Amino acid sequence: MTHKILPISIIYINKEMLNQRIDNFMRSKFKSVPKSMIYRIIRTGKIRINKKRIKPHYKLKIGDILKIPPIKILCDIKNTFFPLNHSTNLLNRILYEDSHLLIINKPSGIAVHGGSGLNFGVIEYFRKLRPLNKFLELVHRIDRDTSGVLILAKKRTSLVSLHEQLREKKIKKEYIALVHGLWPDHIKKISEPLLKIQFKNKQKMVLIDKKGKPSETYFQIKKKFSSSTLLSIIPKTGRTHQIRVHALHAGHPIFFDKRYGKNDLDADIKNNHKINRLLLHSSGVHFIHPKNGNKIYIKAPLDIDFQNYLNTII
């Protein structure tokens, strides 16, 4: 481990930064600085706006002058390695790009962002690959083990617009999943509240519980096989692990779901077919383009391993 001192920073707030909370702005601007340190230097008044102390919830205004003191951080030299194979793979998986948006077909097994022992996620890879992009943020998240459509915003105005569409449920996401067993024809919608809990070992689980948040998922049968069903799925809400938990609730967990699946059945299939990934894929997304107002529909083809497994059971 070694120390690095970030120099004094003076930042002039423009319209791209407008209405951001100062704590969120600092966390996005200084990603290598621990969150606890950011809140400490705000609370102690070391961060000043227009020469005045501010609260963590202060929202930035155009013309504000932000002064940030020198910050001493720890750097782990071993963790700066940037895997070239992943970065090349991600560049080959771009589905759509313009001056406002970057949309990729995320592979299974790569997290959308670093943390919890991970040095790099999709957003860190693209920030390294696109150093001239001054702004690049995730519009939404999908699970590490889920593949498919992932939207990144290249401008803050685009991020704000798409977040508003998410809140107003104007963005429609489509998924494909292979589940165990024969899905009943009558189950077309599951509306069960979901509660997220965390254990002492920091492992997180989502349970169906009346104290949870309202959640709604629509299911349509695409094809039934001898002992499995391929489903088209549309989540109306965007809760953590929503599709996976609702599928389990119906008695038909998704193939190779290490947290909510049937490990005994999955183990036999892994040995026979050499596949070991969650068979859940974000196959498409509908939204309104944040700049020109056009209706956009982006489709993401199935990964080769997912498609190859389907070919073996047809």
Curated annotation (Swiss-Prot):
Residues 20-84 form the S4 RNA-binding domain. Its EC number is 5.4.99.24. Keywords: Isomerase, RNA-binding, rRNA processing. It catalyses: uridine(955/2504/2580) in 23S rRNA = pseudouridine(955/2504/2580) in 23S rRNA. InterPro entries: PsdUridine_synth_cat_dom_sf (IPR020103), PsdUridine_synth_RluA-like_CS (IPR006224), PsdUridine_synth_RluC/D (IPR006225), PsdUridine_synth_RsuA/RluA (IPR006145), RluA_PseudoU_synthase (IPR050188), S4_RNA-bd (IPR002942), S4_RNA-bd_sf (IPR036986). It comes from the Bacteria. It holds the Pfam family PseudoU_synth_2. The keyword Isomerase applies. It is an enzyme of class 5 (isomerase). The keyword Protein transport does not apply. One of its GO terms (biological process) is enzyme-directed rRNA pseudouridine synthesis. Responsible for synthesis of pseudouridine from uracil at positions 955, 2504 and 2580 in 23S ribosomal RNA. PANTHER family: MITOCHONDRIAL RNA PSEUDOURIDINE SYNTHASE, RIBOSOMAL LARGE SUBUNIT PSEUDOURIDINE SYNTHASE C. This is Ribosomal large subunit pseudouridine synthase C. It comes from Buchnera aphidicola subsp. Acyrthosiphon pisum (strain APS).
